[in-house]
């Protein structure tokens, strides 16, 4: 009987420690929120300029020619040339 009582006592102690530690972790996560640090420019950009800057940032404006530049050239010049024979290097 004493062995079962010791086992139950250690299980209860372990369970209480797990509950206590999880509660402390919960409190730490809830109360340790840090706000974002925002750095604003001294002179805010206008709406149109800001949109253009975002387009340049995410889509790399200026790297590709505009769509209108392909209009008068036909389809064949805008496509890659297909080789007439297999490439010996990659076969």
Curated annotation (Swiss-Prot):
Residues carrying sugar: 86
Secreted is among the record's keywords: yes
Source organism superkingdom: Eukaryota
Keywords (A to Z) from UniProt: Developmental protein, Differentiation, Glycoprotein, Hydroxylation, Secreted, Signal
Region forming the signal peptide: 1-35
Sites of Hydroxyproline modification: 83, 86
Family: Belongs to the CLV3/ESR signal peptide family.
Protein name according to UniProt: CLAVATA3/ESR (CLE)-related protein 27
Gene: CLE27
């Amino acid at each position: 009987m004493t062995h079962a009582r010791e086992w139950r006592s250690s299980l209860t102690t372990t369970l209480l420690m797990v509950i206590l530690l999880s509660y402390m972790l919960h409190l730490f996560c809830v109360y340790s929120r840090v706000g974002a640090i925002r750095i604003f420019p001294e002179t805010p950009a206008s709406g149109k300029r800001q949109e253009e800057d975002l387009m340049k940032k995410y889509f790399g404006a200026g790297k590709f020619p505009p769509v209108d530049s392909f209009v008068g050239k036909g389809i064949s010049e805008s496509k890659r040339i297909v080789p007439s024979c297999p490439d010996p290097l990659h076969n």
